[in-house]
């Protein structure tokens, strides 16, 4: 492995792997180290939210992830009085939306997500250095020097940038002197385990409410096991043995016909709710659980970390290739407020779960992360009124029924791959952009752009169903610059090409 990578990534969970993929597909030299001797077992965070599925679509792994999971898994909850409530359906407000390709969460084990990310990384020429630990590091104005230990052998690596995606106990965060603000609530504990189950069907996520707390069994797609979750009261035995798990299950369900097998993996979760006061110190960054940890209620943690990496990756690559380093200041400015909002949401969900002795079976739009955006960021520029539904900084919506030279496509099919995309309604503008950095798409026909032409050229779009004009609230002059991470950088309804040119010039 090179001793002078541009980026050293510490921690090869979902966040670190996503960042490595972002760099690899842009040909940025990196090293990805992981202290564990091999891939981590355990389902852990098992819920993939729709916005994260869009990230995986962009990275080229969504089909693999979907193949090993289940969308909108039914939920069956037995109440304190024995009443059974069914839920888990796709939110009504999100059904048949051409701007949203994935409308509800996917259940899949976290190790399957890591597996798909490692496979894609290998296809891009990258790999994980397992059994390699960060000992310490120092930084200067020009670089970071890190001491690594691999099997007792130490070496110094010099990198331009260091990213700590090494979890809640992050060595990178601690050695950077970054405060991890928040609290540990020892009274809120939960046993989590992966195990085989007899006497229970796999057609739903089963939950039971009880005065002493909830217990649940969720079938894990693409495996033969369930994820067991059982809350533990203060002072209650938190033994991870099969006998204790079986005892808790029988006491809270009143059923002795459900038989658990020896856990393949288990852990005791405690409520740690914390947020780093900074995401960056000089040439060192934090991402994922190293920067924020919270309750699993609402299924936000892994998703937020993956989206941290999706935000940081293209910016690091741009700076490595000559963009101003000030671009990297926008990482904390954009992502830390998102994490703060996630903590607020997950805390509210946790309080509801504790109060009601179990979590809700109703899915809604609050957790799917499609409303996450960066309005007000220095990377968000538009000439629209503040009351406009779509503004710069928002997630770029999808659209269906687009006729191109290659047949019918979704918009996300055309924007995939991690480049800027300039979407114009009407005649394509002349901005002199490098086509290796920006993709040019022009809506040349449809409700907002006139009659269908007899010939469709490369890059031209016929908006046959009017979905793209509607999603972007476009006129025949509108220009939309979509960032590499799928958020809107510029909207100009007046068709001002200077706004786009100035924006792109700042990235050079």
Region roles according to the model:
Residues 130-144:
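A conserved short coil-to-beta-strand element within the FAD-binding core of flavoproteins
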Residues 3-5, 152-161:
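Core beta-strand elements of the Rossmann-like FAD/NAD(P) dinucleotide-binding domain
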Residues 2-6, 10, 25-26, 35, ...:
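Helical substrate-recognition/capping region of FAD-dependent monooxygenase/halogenase enzymes
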Residues 68, 239-300, 304, 338, ...:
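FAD/FMN-dependent oxidoreductases across multiple families
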Residues 24-45:
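Glycine-rich FAD pyrophosphate-binding loop
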Residues 41-44, 48-116, 120-122:
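Active-site-adjacent segment of FAD-dependent monooxygenases/related oxidoreductases
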Residues 119, 161, 165-271:
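Conserved FAD-binding catalytic core of PHBH/FMO-like flavoproteins
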Residues 16-17:
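N-terminal Rossmann-fold NAD(P) dinucleotide-binding loop
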């Amino acid at each position: 492995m090179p001793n002078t990578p541009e980026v050293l990534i510490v921690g090869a969970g979902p966040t670190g792997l996503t960042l490595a993929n972002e760099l690899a597909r842009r040909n940025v030299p990196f090293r990805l180290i992981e202290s564990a001797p091999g891939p981590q077992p355990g389902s852990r965070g098992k819920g993939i939210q729709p916005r994260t599925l869009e990230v995986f679509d962009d990275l080229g792994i969504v089909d693999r992830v979907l193949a090993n999971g289940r969308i909108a898994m039914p939920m069956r909850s037995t109440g304190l009085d024995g009443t059974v409530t069914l839920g888990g359906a796709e939110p009504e407000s999100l059904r048949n939306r051409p701007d949203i390709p994935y409308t509800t969460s996917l259940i899949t084990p976290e190790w399957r997500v890591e597996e798909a990310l490692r496979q894609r990384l290998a296809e891009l020429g990258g790999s994980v250095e397992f059994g390699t630990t960060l000992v310490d590091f120092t930084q200067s104005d020009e670089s970071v020097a890190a001491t690594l230990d691999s099997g007792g052998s130490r070496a110094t690596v010099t990198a331009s940038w260091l990213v700590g995606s090494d979890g809640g106990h992050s060595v990178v965060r601690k050695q950077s002197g970054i405060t991890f603000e928040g609290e540990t609530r020892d009274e809120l504990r939960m046993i989590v385990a992966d195990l085989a189950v007899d006497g229970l069907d796999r057609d739903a996520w089963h939950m039971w409410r009880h005065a002493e707390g909830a217990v649940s069994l969720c079938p894990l797609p693409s495996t033969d096991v369930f994820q067991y979750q059982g809350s533990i009261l203060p002072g209650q035995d938190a033994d991870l043995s099969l006998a204790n798990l079986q005892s808790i299950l029988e006491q809270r369900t009143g059923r002795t016909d459900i038989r658990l097998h020896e856990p393949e993996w288990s852990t005791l979760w405690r409520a740690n709710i914390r947020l780093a006061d900074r995401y960056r110190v000089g040439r060192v960054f934090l991402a994922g659980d190293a920067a924020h940890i919270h309750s699993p209620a609402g299924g936000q943690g892994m998703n937020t970390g993956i989206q941290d990496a999706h935000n940081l990756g293209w910016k690091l690559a741009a700076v490595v290739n000559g963009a101003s380093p000030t671009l990297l200041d926008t990482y904390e400015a954009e992502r830390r407020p998102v994490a703060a909002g996630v903590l607020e949401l997950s805390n509210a969900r946790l309080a509801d779960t504790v109060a009601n002795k179990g979590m809700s079976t109703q899915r809604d739009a609050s957790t799917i992360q499609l409303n996450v955006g960066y309005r007000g960021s220095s990377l968000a520029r538009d000439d629209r009124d503040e009351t406009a539904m779509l503004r710069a900084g928002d997630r770029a919506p999808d659209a269906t029924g687009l006729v191109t030279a290659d047949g019918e496509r979704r918009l996300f099919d055309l924007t995939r791959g991690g480049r800027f995309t300039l979407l114009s309604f009407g005649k394509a503008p002349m901005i002199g952009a490098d086509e290796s950095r920006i993709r040019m798409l022009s809506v040349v026909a449809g409700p907002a752009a006139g009659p269908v032409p007899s010939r469709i050229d490369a890059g031209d779009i016929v908006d046959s169903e009017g979905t793209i004009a509607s999603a972007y609230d476009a006129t025949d002059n509108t220009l939309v610059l979509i960032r590499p991470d799928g958020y809107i950088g510029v909207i100009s309804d007046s068709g001002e090409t200077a706004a786009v040119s100035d924006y792109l010039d700042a990235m050079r």
